[in-house]
């Protein structure tokens, strides 16, 4: 099987390696989501808050992801932007039950969407409205309105409801991200 994998990679039929940056406020579920995307045998049993960043690898049908899981505490947020220039996609995770920090979420998300290395390159941004299992969580439509996303015209973004603990919604969101990244890579070839 190793020979066939090598042969398919040689002829460009293997999985394409891509870098993504995973950002969001502290306690939004970034690391738990990435843990769900790994194979069952490589998942961590205990999730601890990220300090700085951690690289997590996982694959979809066509892409092999190197995900830079960025810490969400205020003192680390300024480091996010240094990873955008070498990425082909961004995942922004938010806690859909955290109504108190919605204005802060809006500010941070718009900084990402408008960042020169995101907006000018047209890299896709997938927003994961996590913790939808919590009673009183906002819907994607409510979050879109609260964050003013309907006013944001540049770039490619989408929003998806997820639950990191169960994995609900992650397959659909990752299919969307994979599709958008493949489109992005095709436009870069020409």
From Swiss-Prot:
Residues the entry annotates as binding GTP: 24-31, 50, 69-73, 130-133, 164
Domain of life, source organism: Eukaryota
Subcellular localization: Cytoplasm
Family matches, as InterPro entries: Arl6, P-loop_NTPase, Small_GTP-bd, Small_GTPase_ARF, Small_GTPase_ARF/SAR
Keyword field contains Metal-binding: yes
Source organism of this protein record: Caenorhabditis briggsae
GO molecular function list: GTP binding; GTPase activity; metal ion binding
Family: Belongs to the small GTPase superfamily. Arf family.
Binding site for Mg(2+): 31, 50
Keyword hit for Kinase: no
Covalently attached lipid (N-myristoyl glycine), positions: 2
GO cellular component terms attached to this protein's record: axoneme; cytoplasm; cytosol; dendrite
Gene Ontology BP annotations: cilium assembly; intracellular protein transport; protein localization to cilium; vesicle-mediated transport
Pfam family, one: Arf
The protein's name in its UniProt record: ADP-ribosylation factor-like protein 6
Entry keywords, A to Z: Cytoplasm, GTP-binding, Lipoprotein, Magnesium, Metal-binding, Myristate, Nucleotide-binding
């Amino acid at each position: 099987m190793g020979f066939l994998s090598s042969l398919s990679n040689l002829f460009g039929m293997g999985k394409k390696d891509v870098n993504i940056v995973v950002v969001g406020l502290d306690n939004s579920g970034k690391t738990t989501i990435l843990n769900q995307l790994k194979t069952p045998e490589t998942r961590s049993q205990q999730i601890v808050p990220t300090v700085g960043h951690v690289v997590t690898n996982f694959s979809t049908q066509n892409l092999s992801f190197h995900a830079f899981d960025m810490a969400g505490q205020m003192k680390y947020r300024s480091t996010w932007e240094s990873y955008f220039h070498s990425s082909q996609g961004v995942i922004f995770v938010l806690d859909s039950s955290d109504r108190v920090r919605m204005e802060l979420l809006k500010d941070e998300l718009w900084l990402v969407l408008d960042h020169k290395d995101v907006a000018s390159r047209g890299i896709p941004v997938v927003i994961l409205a996590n913790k939808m299992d919590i009673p009183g969580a906002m819907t994607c439509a409510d979050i879109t309105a609260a964050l003013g996303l309907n006013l944001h015209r540049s770039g490619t973004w989408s929003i998806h409801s997820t639950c990191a603990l169960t994995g609900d919604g992650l397959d659909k969101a990752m299919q969307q991200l994979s599709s958008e990244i493949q489109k992005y890579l095709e436009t870069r070839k020409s």
